[in-house]
From Swiss-Prot:
Subunit: Interacts with sld3.
UniProt keyword annotations, A-Z: Cell cycle, DNA replication, Nucleus
Name by which UniProt lists this protein: Cell division control protein 45 homolog
GO BP annotations, alphabetical order: DNA replication initiation; double-strand break repair via break-induced replication; mitotic DNA replication preinitiation complex assembly; mitotic intra-S DNA damage checkpoint signaling
Compositional bias segments (type: Acidic residues): 153-170
UniProt KW Cell cycle keyword: yes
Gene name in the database record: sna41
Molecular functions (GO terms): chromatin binding; DNA replication origin binding; single-stranded DNA binding
Pfam families according to UniProt: CDC45
Main localization (coarse): nucleus
Length: 638
């Protein structure tokens, strides 16, 4: 079943009512992505405020979810609610979670498409609707109910019915010699009319069933896309309860921004959410009157944690990096200036020179730049950036002040927590150092040991990021980590483009990362996805300059030596066009790689593993990569 937006508060109050008796009644399963992290923090704040005991368990994939569910919930009679954050809506949860009649399962997930069994079967599974189920899926709703109706399902037995009819005809013929000729004629005529009518009914039912099946297949085969930020959904819950505050508002802003910078936000949902959050910022953070301004700078006080609307540059971490590095490592600027080439870097230098900025000045940390130059930077960019294809270099965003310590933008925090999820506070990949292989260990035993160590490391990273959300010192340290990651992405991307290592196949482009100093970084799906987005945007912009409007999607693979597998990510071209063009009825552009990966898995003998909550991520045995790519090249990906 699904929960309408107007019923969010009622759904939460049921949790509160069930927790009166005490005990740990709520279990949270949280995907390892930034939006789910922010949503978990916000929901945990709500639950703590109502003194509701709960457990938080990050999960890395479907197998981990299934195993955690069995371990934590079997023989645990206290649990009354399971809440899934950014995981679960795309699969039939009855196949993954322990079924208990007195346990309600809440699914709050931005991944699409929904598994229709979760939202239409009346059981203990409740999917939070961001509006698309109620508003956009009426045709799907009617088709699902009709397809699964008892009346149409009877048609499946039509073949056996026909056989029985033929048997009756044989019986009729066997008694003809004992009947009068008049009786025989009437009997045959009556039976013929009934048979014709029955067959017509069966044919009509079969036709309707095929029509409904086609509608349902079309829904699933469109590929994967994204709905509203789940942090925004939970902020709506807090607002309905009258519990919203600045901390929750900031989490909602960061959650939305995370989707935007990872190309997972549709124009439809982003504009709607931005408008609502903008109103909340103005309501909860009124501008101080002139005679009320105290403190040293712009009305700041040591305890000021206000949120402000502010125009931002599409330069990564510009407040904390040098202006030059921020522009050089920005995907937006880099793709349009072609910074992977010497000519592209010269274009960047010319742009800075036209704005009156020397390279020496630009390579200083931004906060140490000349104040007059910083004041004129916005007007200079508006004047000169369009000549270099940077038409949208300035966009509306939010910042938060942390007393006299620092000011962070929503994108700063998004990059920071994303880096923590990928690498943790230590900034190293622990499993590459700690997983040793003994001589008597089989391949399967070592693989299991490595995957367990990897999952434990990712869980540790999750808690590092979770704690950093309310610790500005940890966030500032994580900014350095985000810079390190972005340098690795740009460095690797430039290498692939310079070597012309991105090959064009029948229906997609393909790139392979199987060596290099940064290979270990791309063992994490989130890091490899960022790398894929950077390369795809660079190629698409290059083609757009030559007038090509239809671009091929990109498949990027990174070799994981310990597993002897390739981690593979499929990036759709719509990831970049959806924010510029009008969205379709389903919001964000569709990525068909999940559907294609599943089809390849079903039709080949290649050893593949689809365990990630992102449908466009898959693992392939090293020896099967060629078979996998050959089969994939015949699939429709656009």
């Amino acid at each position: 079943m699904f929960i309408k937006r107007s019923d969010y508060a009622s759904a939460y109050l049921k949790i509160k009512e069930a927790s009166v008796s005490g005990g740990c009644t709520v279990q949270l399963f949280v995907a390892l992505d930034p939006d789910a992290l922010c949503a978990c923090k916000l929901l945990s704040t709500l639950l703590k405020g109502d003194f509701i005991s709960h457990k938080i368990r990050p999960v890395s994939g479907y197998r981990d979810l299934e195993q955690a569910n069995k371990t934590l919930l079997e023989q645990n009679e206290d649990i009354k609610f399971i809440i899934l954050l950014n995981c679960g809506t795309m699969v039939d949860l009855n196949n993954y979670l322990v079924s208990m009649e007195d346990v309600s399962i809440y699914v709050i997930d931005s991944h699409r498409p929904h598994n229709l069994n979760n939202i239409y079967i009346e059981n203990n599974i409740f999917v939070f609707d961001d509006g698309d189920i109620e508003e956009d899926m009426n045709k799907i709703h009617d088709a699902w109910y009709a397809f699964n109706s008892h009346e149409l399902s009877d048609e499946e037995n039509s073949d056996s019915s026909n056989e029985r009819e033929e048997e009756v005809e044989d019986d009729n013929r066997s008694v003809e010699s004992y009947s009068s000729s008049d009786y025989q004629a009437r009997s045959r005529r009556r039976f013929s009319e009934e048979t014709t009518q029955r067959r017509a009914e069966i044919k009509e039912k079969r036709k309707k069933r095929k029509e409904f099946a086609s509608i349902l297949s079309e829904y699933y085969e469109k590929g994967s896309w994204y709905g509203e930020s789940i942090t925004n959904i939970l902020f709506a819950v807090a607002s309905m309860l009258g519990r919203e505050d600045n901390d929750m508002l900031w989490l909602a802003i960061v959650g939305l921004t995370c989707l935007e910078i990872h190309c997972q936000s549709s124009k439809k949902y982003f504009n709607r959410s931005y408008s609502l959050l903008k109103d909340e910022v103005n309501r909860l953070n009124p501008s101080p009157l002139e005679n009320q301004i105290v403190g040293r700078a712009h009305g700041k006080t040591p305890h000021d944690q206000s949120i402000r609307l502010e125009d931002e540059f599409r330069f990564m971490l510009v407040r904390h990096w040098s202006l030059y590095d921020s522009m050089l490592h920005s995907a937006y600027v880099g793709s349009r200036l072609h910074i992977w080439s010497e000519e592209g870097r010269k274009r960047l230098h010319k742009l800075l020179a036209k704005m009156g900025l020397s390279l020496v000045e630009c390579k200083q940390t931004y906060i140490h730049m000349n104040m007059d130059l910083k004041k004129t930077l916005k007007s200079s960019l508006k004047r000169f950036a369009p000549f270099y294809g940077l038409d949208d270099v300035i966009f509306h965003s939010f910042t938060r002040t942390y007393g006299f310590k620092c000011t962070l933008s929503a994108s700063d925090v998004s990059y920071a927590i994303s880096a923590l999820l990928e690498m943790g506070n230590t900034g190293v990949l622990l499993q590459s150092k700690t997983v040793a292989r003994s001589p008597d260990m089989t391949e399967e035993e070592y693989l299991e040991k490595f995957e367990n160590a990897q999952n434990q490391e990712w869980l540790h990273n999750f808690y590092d990021a979770y704690d950093a959300l309310d610790d500005v010192d940890s966030l500032e340290r994580a900014l350095k980590l985000a810079m390190h990651l972005q340098r690795a992405i740009v460095r690797t991307g430039i290498t692939l483009l310079e070597k012309r290592a991105i090959k064009t196949l029948r229906s997609f482009r393909f790139g392979l990362i199987n060596e290099g100093p940064d290979l270990k970084i791309f063992m994490h799906p989130l890091a490899l996805t960022k790398m894929s987005l950077w390369i795809a945007e660079a190629i698409n912009e290059q083609e757009r300059e030559f007038g090509k409007l239809r671009h091929l999607p990109l498949v990027l693979a990174a070799f994981v030596e310990e597993k002897n597998r390739y981690l593979i990510v499929g990036t759709s071209t719509s990831a970049f066009t959806s924010n510029e063009d009008d969205d379709d009825d389903d919001g964000h552009g569709h990525n068909r790689f999940g559907v294609a990966f599943q089809e390849v898995a079903n039709m080949t003998s290649a050893t593949l593993q689809m365990d990630c909550f992102e449908a466009s991520v898959i693992e392939c045995q090293k020896s099967d990569l060629g078979v996998f790519l050959e089969s994939l090249s015949f699939k429709t990906l656009l």
